């Protein structure tokens, strides 16, 4: 007679083992119809499995976060059901849930096309309409092997081989189709309604390019039709803003096969990069950072001392010269300690803040590369603060202010903060972990900031705070971080003389605001849809001649404007002025200045904004004042 305790504290006693579906029915038929699964003593549980013992039970519907995850996982199995009906000879690999959706990796000699995707989606819709029950079979490992041997599902058999012999394996039966999963899954396809198959891509078994090539089908699913439609609109908008497309369209950068994951910056894109670097440098200078530059290639002995050789050797590019092996640096921290170590340091010298626009290389898998967002060569706005334990809180507090100042400049007002604390495997005393975690928490709390605790998610060498920004499409990008490090200063012999004239190791704070220039510029391209604010735009103003008579004045004004430090260009082609204005608008140039006979007569320009707003007639001195004001605001309206 299991006693079931519900979330409101009420209890129900049943005469025999009971399912979550039956518990829901005892509360109400409406809840029973909506029930997808449940939690039994905080463990996810299928709606149709019996509960034998006294338990705490939570009923899950599509309104719950766990509910939508279960729906998405069930849709992945539906892909398998549909694809196996349409293409019986294919083999199913894995089909997990991902952010906002799901995918299934499939081995097939036949190459799927977008037309096949439509066919598969139609078959899924037909299966959903049948409202069939999804049956769960709990079997032994031996029985699972037999099941998938009969179906010649080689990838499933490989997965089963890795499962311990003891215990039961969950198989989910969709009519004639059987798949395996930890579960839970929906009890009936009536819960599967609002979905869309999105795209095809390639992948490899276990993500290893030396293994079999697979084909991946991506999809999304939601509890309500409106949620699905809203998401599809966001996808459409994201495709329109794709930095790779806009980068090509506006000649910002390109990537080519001869140098995968490394950026060829064009003049327009490099201008944005340089303006961004100048801005960050000004921020660093205002906050007493010392800018340094360290070598690209460093003997492997330093990486062995720092511990990176053992942990990250496979991610490093290496080269050899005169019987010595060098690593192209994947990060800057060991080199910054070498700069700190030059000369004796006193506690009076601390904190010392060393910053570098450090170019790093990491041998990312080719399949993971993605435009500017995931590259092999990137530049970090990297800095390391060498300080005492007592200075951690003040340094972190100042850094938090910097992060918010910079993100606000670019229009990012919603910042998500996560604090990661000590993992099980760690270095350093409990005392210093206590002090460090308390310092980070106090720095956040003293500013009345909301933050999320991630217990055990810190690095082995110290706790950290991560700063993620939310863009105009509600996507979250983790960019900034500040990380406490007790380990590396010890490993690389960084010391200072304390108040008692004794040598001590400083604490090192790793910190970055943008993360990498490449990725941050990619985010900005998509955030602004390449309509950069005037301070950041490759060209800030374009001068258009109406007739050939106005070309000379156009060129003269252009020279004067550029001599003042603005970024200006001309369009003096023999084209109609309407066409030139459209071209300048498509080119995303913030200010468009037209010069005709009337403007030339009064030594002025007719100015319009990128959005088409007529700003009026301006003489050059007034134009400079306007541009200075817009540039100083950096696109902010307050």
Swiss-Prot record:
Needed cofactors: Zn(2+)
One Pfam family linked to the record: HGTP_anticodon
Job of this protein: Catalyzes the attachment of threonine to tRNA(Thr) in a two-step reaction: L-threonine is first activated by ATP to form Thr-AMP and then transferred to the acceptor end of tRNA(Thr). Also edits incorrectly charged L-seryl-tRNA(Thr).
GO CC terms: cytosol
Cofactor remark from the record: Binds 1 zinc ion per subunit.
Subcellular location: Cytoplasm
Covalent S-S links between cysteines: none
Protein name: Threonine--tRNA ligase
GO biological process: threonyl-tRNA aminoacylation
Catalytic activity from the UniProt record: tRNA(Thr) + L-threonine + ATP = L-threonyl-tRNA(Thr) + AMP + diphosphate + H(+)
């Amino acid at each position: 007679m299991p006693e079931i305790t519900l979330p409101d504290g009420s209890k129900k006693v049943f005469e025999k083992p009971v399912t979550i579906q039956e518990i829901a029915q005892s509360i109400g038929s409406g809840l029973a119809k909506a029930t997808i699964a449940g939690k039994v003593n905080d463990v996810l549980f299928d709606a149709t499995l019996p509960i034998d013992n006294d338990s705490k039970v939570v009923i899950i519907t599509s309104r719950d976060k766990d509910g939508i995850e279960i729906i998405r996982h069930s849709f992945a199995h539906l892909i398998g059901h549909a694809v196996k009906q349409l293409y019986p000879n294919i083999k199913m690999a894995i089909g997990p849930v991902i952010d906002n959706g799901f995918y299934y990796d499939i081995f097939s000699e036949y190459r799927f096309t977008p037309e096949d995707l439509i066919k598969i989606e139609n078959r899924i819709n037909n299966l959903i309409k049948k409202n069939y029950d999804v049956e769960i079979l709990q079997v032994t490992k031996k029985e699972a092997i037999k099941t998938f041997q009969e179906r010649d599902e080689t990838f499933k058999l490989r997965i089963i081989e890795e499962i311990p012999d003891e215990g039961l394996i969950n198989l989910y039966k969709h009519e004639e189709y059987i798949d395996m999963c930890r579960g839970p899954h929906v009890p009936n396809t009536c819960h599967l309604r609002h979905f869309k198959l999105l795209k095809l891509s390639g992948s490899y078994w276990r993500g290893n390019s030396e293994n079999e090539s697979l084909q991946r089908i991506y999809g999304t699913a939601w509890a309500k039709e409106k949620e699905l439609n809203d998401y599809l609109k966001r996808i459409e908008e994201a495709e329109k803003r794709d930095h790779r497309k806009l980068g090509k369209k506006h000649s910002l950068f390109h990537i080519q096969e001869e140098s995968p994951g490394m950026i060829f910056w064009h003049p327009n894109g490099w201008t944005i990069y340089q303006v961004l670097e100048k801005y960050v440098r000004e921020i660093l200078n205002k906050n007493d950072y010392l800018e340094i530059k360290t070598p690209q290639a460093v003997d492997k002995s330093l990486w062995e001392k720092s511990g990176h050789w053992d942990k990250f050797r496979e991610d490093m590019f290496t080269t050899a010269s005169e019987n010595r092996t060098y690593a192209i640096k994947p990060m800057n921290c060991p080199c910054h300690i070498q700069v700190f170590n030059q000369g004796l340091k006193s506690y009076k010298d601390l904190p010392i803040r060393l910053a570098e626009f450090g170019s790093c290389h990491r041998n990312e898998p080719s399949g993971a590369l993605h435009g500017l967002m995931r590259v092999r060569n990137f530049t970090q706005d990297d800095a390391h603060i060498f300080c005492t334990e007592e200075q951690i809180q003040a340094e972190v507090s100042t850094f938090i202010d910097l992060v918010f100042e910079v993100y606000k400049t670019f229009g990012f007002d919603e910042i998500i903060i996560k604090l990661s604390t000590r993992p099980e495997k760690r270095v350093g005393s409990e005392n210093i972990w206590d002090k460090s975690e308390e310092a980070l928490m106090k720095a956040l709390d003293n500013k009345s900031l909301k933050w999320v605790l991630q217990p055990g998610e810190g690095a082995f060498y110290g706790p950290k705070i991560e700063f993620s920004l939310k863009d105009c499409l509600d996507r979250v990008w983790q960019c900034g971080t500040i990380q406490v490090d007790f380990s590396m200063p010890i490993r690389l012999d960084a010391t200072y003389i304390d108040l008692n004239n004794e040598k001590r190791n400083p604490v090192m704070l790793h910190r970055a605001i943008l993360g990498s220039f490449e990725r941050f510029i990619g985010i900005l391209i998509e955030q602004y849809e390449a309509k950069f604010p005037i301070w950041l735009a490759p060209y800030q103003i374009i001068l258009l001649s109406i007739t050939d008579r106005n070309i000379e004045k156009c060129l003269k004004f252009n020279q004067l404007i550029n001599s003042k430090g603005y970024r200006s260009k001309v369009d003096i082609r023999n084209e109609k002025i309407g066409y030139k204005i459209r071209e300048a608008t498509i080119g995303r140039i913030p200010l468009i200045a037209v010069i005709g006979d009337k403007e030339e007569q009064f030594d002025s320009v007719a100015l319009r904004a990128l959005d088409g707003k007529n700003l009026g007639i301006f003489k050059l001195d007034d134009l400079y004042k306007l541009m200075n004001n817009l540039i100083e605001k950096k696109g902010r309206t307050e």
